[in-house]
Each structure stands twice: as structure tokens, then as C-alpha cells.
Amino acid sequence: MSKRSCQILTLLGLCLVCHEATLVGGHVLVYRKATSQLIEEFNDLPAQFGPNLPSNGLKVYVVPARRPYYGCDSLDRPPHLKYPPSAKFVALVARGECVFERKIRVAQNASYSAVIVYNNEGDDLEQMSAENITGIRIPSVFVGHTTGKALATYFTTEVVLIINDELPFNINTQLILPFSILIGMCFIIMVIYMIYKCIREQRRLRRHRLPKSMLKKLPVLRYTKNNANNKYDTCVICLEDFIEDDKLRVLPCSHPYHTHCIDPWLTENRRVCPICKRKVFTKGEARASRSRQPSLDNVTDTDDDTTPLLQQQQSNGRQVGQVSSASSAGGAAGSSSSVAAAAVAGTTRHGTFRRGHAGRNPFEESQSSDDENALLASTVRPATSSGAHERINPFDRAPNLPAHLAEQLTESRRSVWSRINFASFFRRQPAVISVAAPPYLERVESGTSAMGLPVTGTIAVASPASNNILNPNLSGSFKDEDDMPPHRSIYEPIAISTPAADSATVDDSAFLQTPTQGGIGVAALPHSASDRQFLI
């Protein structure tokens, strides 16, 4: 239970007490007539109907009702002969047998000035009410059972009653015990909570302070002037120069201070050096273990000012195997697969990729430039000897192959169901666009046909590392990406038909050009092992 809950419960208890106090509308005072001495005082509660009591009270003599004490049928008239002529009388009747309204009307008809109704069971006070208040001209009050029995004993000319509607301070005795328990529980909970907070605060302060027992283990030296080993001549706490034979306490960081300056700082403030903020540990003191979570945001309290902000990246053999397999698959599948392999390998906190030397892609090394090979060779040698991971440039070039060539180079073959394009049955077939071959291609083909050479064949593209034909070691292309149609590449062959010597039609896909522009260069190279000729 929090402190706020205790306050709410206390407020509710006070409201209940105030509510009970407001129900006590006045009291009945018992005086001895001869001496005007107050004998006893009782609490009462005025009724909701009838006239109000006078401000200075109503002075009356009590007359109890005869058996059965309810006063529902009739009441004896007041005994005026024994009392003074100006005396007023109040009828004392018990609760029950009839409604309050009937009791008041019967007493009014019997010439009584007021009515006191006492409870038949218990001392609880209840505010009387009536359905028809017409014709009621006398006031009435309600008292407890004990009060009614006590007032019946004052049926004498020597005792007079004064009934008023003052609001005395009164607390119902039935609420004292629950209210006391409530206040006591709130107080105990508040004390326990404050003790807990104090202990926690003391532990926190003690953890950041140096105990006095440990303070004695720090060395104390005497200052000597003109000493070559003195690097500091001023105490940074009091800003006073050291004088001869001063007691200086030297911290583990080699910073000296006056003993009367640094001792209160370490024992009452924090156990850190005021200059370098290094935590002070004495000789032989056990240091708390530094525990960090993988997240940099979760730092324990045991970290001091010398704790590195970036922890070393943890790696294991399983990650090395994943990197090797992912790198070999990525060299065949293109840039998208290489990036996925790099993601599996993980990156450092500085953004550089890691990979193992055992799983290096031979295709990437064969397609790199001489400078890059020299750089990689210089970084591979120490990694090979130590067997650890090496860092490479995050912008390391990866093969950029078209999707269909990357699929041809992968070892895994697609299933029969994956080769079927079900979407083609539900969409319209695009119109076939025929791209005519340039004139120089026709002249070359006519020359080869006249010489009796066979028709041109198809040359396989051997794992190019870039889409630049002039220099495969350079990544990129001379074409703008906006000019390239989606899912097309300069390596995509275009089937053309050339007449052969025997009027046969053979598909030729050796000529490489884009669908929108002409080829960059065309050369007819004879093949040494056969009589076929290839166009590059």
C-alpha cells in the first residue's frame, strides 16, 4: 500500500467520523434545580419535522409514560399541582408499536411542550421522520436506550432538563476502534516505507563512497619542494599551493591532494578523483563485476568512468559456418545473394562487415582488380595465422548479374512445379516486339555464309562480375538506370534469324545488345577448336 493510498483511507475515515458527528444535533443537560449544578449530559438528535428548539434551550421537567411506555394511545396529563405554575413538561416514550408522528400527536393533545423518544434496543441515534407533519406544533428529539432509562429516574421536582440543539464535539464510540485501526495501519505502513527508503538511500550512498577503513590504505606522502617528481603544486579542491612538509594523499591515478581536503570528498561525496573522475580502489579491494546486456542502453551501476562504451562483438564458430555457406551461394546468385550473406555474417558496431577466410568466395577474388587483390592479400595473411575474423570494406564490390543468369549458375535446380508460370494462364500475353539486327551484322553473316562456314553459335558468359563489357573489373554501366527497362540487362540475348547455306533457319543468340540501343562493339572471333564463329 502506497503513501497515497494511506492518505485516501485516512480521508475516508475522517469523512465517516464527521458524518456521525453531524448526526448528533444537540444534547440534553440535567441540572439540579436548587444549586443549578450540572448532573449529567446526554446526546440527542432532533426530528426532521416539527418546530425547532429555542436557541437558548427548552427548560422542562421530564414525565415518563406508563406501561407499555410507547405512548401510542394516550398519555397522562402533566402534574401541574406539584410543579411551579410556569413549568413545562416533556413526555418520555419508548420507540415501537406505532410511528413517530402518532406519538408526537398524542403528546401534543396531552398538553406536553416536547417529546423525548428513546431507542428500544441499543444506543444508536436515528433521525425521526413523518409522512404528514400538518398540525404538529411541539418539538421532539431521539435518544438512546441507556439515556432514556437514565432520564426516567429524574422524574422529580428537584431536577430540571434543558434540551438544546447545540452541536457538541462527539465521536461515536463504535467508530473509535475501526478508526484507530485504520490510522494505525496507515502509520505503520508509512513508517515501514520510510525506513525502506532510508536504507536504500544509505546503501546507494555507501556504494558510491569510500569507507573510512579503506581510506587508510591510500598512501600519504610529505610534500618536498624542488622535487623533480612533483608534477602538481596546487590542490585543486582548496586551490592552495602545497607548502613544505604538507600531508598529501595520493590517489591511484597519481593525483595528490591535501588529506583534509580529499578525505571528506571520498568518504562523504563520491569515491572518484576530482580531476580525472577515475574511481578510487584501494590495494587488495575486490572490484564489482561489470555486467552488460547486449543492448548499449542497459548499463549497470558498477560501470565506472573508464568502462569502454563499445563492447567487443562476440562471435562463434557457428556464425563462421553460416558466413561461409552464405558467401559461396552469394557469389553465384548475384548482388542480392551477397548482401544476404553479409547480413547473415553480421556487421560490427562501426558498420563494417565480417567474414571468415575459410569461406571466401573465389569468384569475387578472381574478378577483383589488382589493387584490390593486393589489399585483400595483405589483410588475409594475419587473419589466416590468427584464425580470427577480418574486417572488409562495406562497399566491397559484389557480382551484379541478371536474375536469369544467376539462376543458371546456382547448383540447386528448380522443381517442376516452380517452373510452371500459373499467372500466365490468367493474364493477357504481351505483344512480341521484333528487333532487327544492324546492317553490319547482316554483312558479317553473309560473308560467313559465302565462305561456307557454319552459322554463328552461342557463347556462354563466364560469371561476369559487372555489367560493363569494356572492362569487367569496373562495376557499373555506361547506361543510365532510367534508360534500362525493368528486369532487363545488357547480357540478355536477342534471338535473330540468319539464312544459312542450306536455307535452314538457326537461332542465334550470340549478339548482345539492349532492346533500346545498339551494341557497344561487335567482333567476329574464330574458335580454335571448331569451325564455328562467335560474335561478341
Swiss-Prot record:
Residues 1-21 form the signal peptide. GO terms for cellular component: cytoplasm; endosome; endosome membrane. GO terms for molecular function: ubiquitin protein ligase activity; zinc ion binding. Residues 307-334 have a biased composition (Low complexity). The chain crosses the membrane at residues 175-195. CDD domains: PA_C_RZF_like (cd02123), RING-H2_RNF13-like (cd16665). Residues 22-174 are extracellular. One of its GO terms (biological process) is positive regulation of transcytosis. Residues 89-151 form the PA domain. SUPFAM superfamilies: PA domain, RING/U-box. Its EC number is 2.3.2.27. It is found in: Endosome membrane. It catalyses: S-ubiquitinyl-[E2 ubiquitin-conjugating enzyme]-L-cysteine + [acceptor protein]-L-lysine = [E2 ubiquitin-conjugating enzyme]-L-cysteine + N(6)-ubiquitinyl-[acceptor protein]-L-lysine. Pfam families: PA, zf-RING_2. A zinc finger (RING-type) spans 235-277. It is an enzyme of class 2 (transferase). Glycans are attached at residues 109, 132. InterPro entries: E3_ligase_sorting_rcpt, PA_dom_sf, PA_domain, Znf_RING, Znf_RING/FYVE/PHD, ZNRF4/RNF13/RNF167_PA. PROSITE patterns: ZF_RING_2 (PS50089). Residues 196-536 are cytoplasmic. Endosomal E3 ubiquitin-protein ligase that regulates the recycling endosome pathway by mediating ubiquitination of Synaptobrevin (Syb). Also acts as a regulator of transcytosis in wing imaginal disks by catalyzing ubiquitination of Syb: ubiquitination of Syb promotes transcytosis of wingless (wg) to the basolateral surface. This is E3 ubiquitin-protein ligase Godzilla. It comes from Drosophila melanogaster (Fruit fly).
